[in-house]
């Protein structure tokens, strides 16, 4: 048996058999082997889901050896990529082609198949999640058949498989609609929760990508606004020194130390939350899109996400604020 754990350490498994295909035939063979044994087969990505979605106690297929771009249509801004390719590797390859993903989340360690299958998303009212950028999929289903699907070919399968949770088969390739490379201007600044909530609609509609982080037990937030710059704009990233201080020292080492302290001494949670909120500073910079979207995450964390109607958000945050104060 092979021991597996997800990134956050919230799910573990000991699969009886782990397949490591390096080509399409290898994926078909893995599916056939599981079927012949009468066992369930789970695809494994990078383990960045917090739930036990990838837990496999019978057969698992690890696609980390099945990577890379297999086809490019620069004129149509469309690329086909193998399922085990990470978002980081994909972004690097797209850079050389003058292309980019239209939108993405703030982690790039996921495989492309795992990211779309679990509904990975970014921010921005006018931009969808990764699954909305998928033009076509190739899927190995339970009987070993290799099916291609798109909006025009097997549209019902395509609609389901884009966020299929690995339940419909093993994705072998993903064809993505891309956009020309672009530069994002980022403005990140501390703010007061009341002010953010009061201006929420204006802020959300006024930026291509808007989000805020609230620190419970206080009224401080970190507000992030990202906006596309005109084509041909020159990136103006933070200096290497500033990046090291902001991202490595403050957002990872200091934050990690605070988290460990709070777990060891829970009564210090409220005061340390306030300390963390008060060390935030404003920063403005611009860079190639994925370098702005993605944030380095060395501190392991567990996250739950809830979707609420936009016009209910202020009320929900107000209730959470009251609950946290108790």
Regions found by a protein language model. Give the residues of each.
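Noncatalytic alpha-helical scaffold of FAD-dependent oxidoreductases
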Residues: 1-326
